[in-house]
Amino acid sequence: VDSLVGSEMCIRDSYYTVQIKRGVIMGEYIENFVDALPDPKRVKEIKKDLESKGVKYIYSHWIDFLGSPKTKPMPISDFEDLCAGKGPQFAVHSVSFVPELGPADNDQIPVPDLDSLLICPWDKTCAWVFSDLWWNGKPYDVCPRQTLKKQIKKNAEADLKFYVGMEPEFFVMKWEDGKPVKAIDRDPIPLRRQAFGYDSEYSIEGMDFLKEIIDILNEDLKWDLHDVVAEGAYGQYELDFGYTDMLGMADRFIFLRVLLKEIAKKHGYFISFMPKTQISDWRSGAHINHSVESISEKNKNIYKDGDKFSARAMNAVAGMLEHGAAITALACPTVNSYNGFVPSVEGLDGGMHTWAPTHMTYGSNNRSAMIRLPQNRFCIEDRASDLTQNPYLTFTLLSAAVTKGITENMQPPEATNKSLYDITEEEGKKIKTLPRNLLEAIDAFKADPLTKEVFSEAMLNNFIGYKYDEWSRYHTTTTDWEI
């Protein structure tokens, strides 16, 4: 759309023809839709810049409710059409679990968020942009990105802006004789008591792969990677990079999963985000660290009160604990996610502590609790989280719980500052455990009234229905442990 003022214009897609006369937008659908379209002048400038850098193709990605990116690759020549809402449309309900819609329903239209645009580091002839889905002239209510943006607006109405940092952990794997094995594994003894974390030789051995990741994150993407951690199992790594706003971190999370897979392919490897790849290994998590800024007091971290955590930080903790099981259903959304919430790894010379959370409580630097208050920064860490999640949905519910805790002045129980692996049976009765399996988590999610406030009915029906089905399908198999 070059201008909304002047002679009669016409925007046409598969289902709608809408007239625009003298700056008046005729019809509710196009009023909302056009308001969301990027500025045409900016679009032209970006297209010119991309072409000058050798970009020939565009991936406009929307995210399904499970957290998978979807796209139709298109030539750069169609970039302006994409940004004007005249690009590819999607029958989202044909490729995603949306039983409310059928083959006769209208398609969804992606509107790109140009602030998320980047050039793909693994193929610099391609650019990537995240898009929001629109349907029948309104934000599509099963679009996770739209859902998070809606909650961000609610948070802002309470004078709160969230910043998030994540600690993604994963295994680097390869195929050997038709079986998946660890690609970086120098230890001939698969089971031993000693943990492998921070191992120097192990870190050095992985550098051929890791150097490329480090350079991309810092030089190409400017994500401010601080370090790479050799985690507690061979072949397992953690990336620690800078925090950003909540929507930006959700975008980074999705892009990182794709990036790691693409770079691994170049080395003959593949990446496993499975939380618990084998019983003898540590769990792979993706801890969520968040802080909150007061919008009216710019740059003020409301979790900091001198050299201690503030009263509002405690309100936030209370909100997270109140809705902890429901948040965990989103942050740990697979059957396998719950295999790691155990105090120790058996078989390692009598067992070895995993440092995985087991209870819905909090403590000062307590890594055995769901919520940790770190000793070196004023943020709140949710440790019951992994890389299989849809971050847009997790951040939506987590921030809603925190906002509720702060605005309602909720108070948490007493902190637990001892290892939860060593508590007595009597002490354990006073502290709720994390959900023990996916079914418990989804039951809690379904019963939590806050989920109905922040998610559309269609989103809830889709997620809950799919996860119940996933639990049922899991029980059609027999595991090696049972045999």
Language model region names:
Residues 118-125, 162-163, 228-233, 281, ...:
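Short glycine/proline-enriched loop/turn "hinge" motifs that connect secondary-structure elements
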Residues 1-13:
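Single conserved hydrophobic/aromatic residue that forms the stacking wall/gate
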Residues 129-135, 237-244, 290, 382:
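Short, hydrophobic beta-strand segments
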Residues 27-33, 42-45, 85, 262-263, ...:
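Catalytic-core signal marking the mid-to-C-terminal active-site face
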Residues 229, 242, 249-277:
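Gly/Pro-rich turn-and-neighbor structural signature
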Residues 163-171, 183-200, 220-241, 271-291, ...:
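Core alpha/beta catalytic barrel or barrel-like domain that forms the active/cofactor pocket
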Residues 26-225, 244, 249-252, 269, ...:
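ATP/Mg2+-dependent ligation/transfer catalytic cores
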Residues 65-70, 138, 172, 233, ...:
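Flexible loop/turn segments at secondary-structure boundaries
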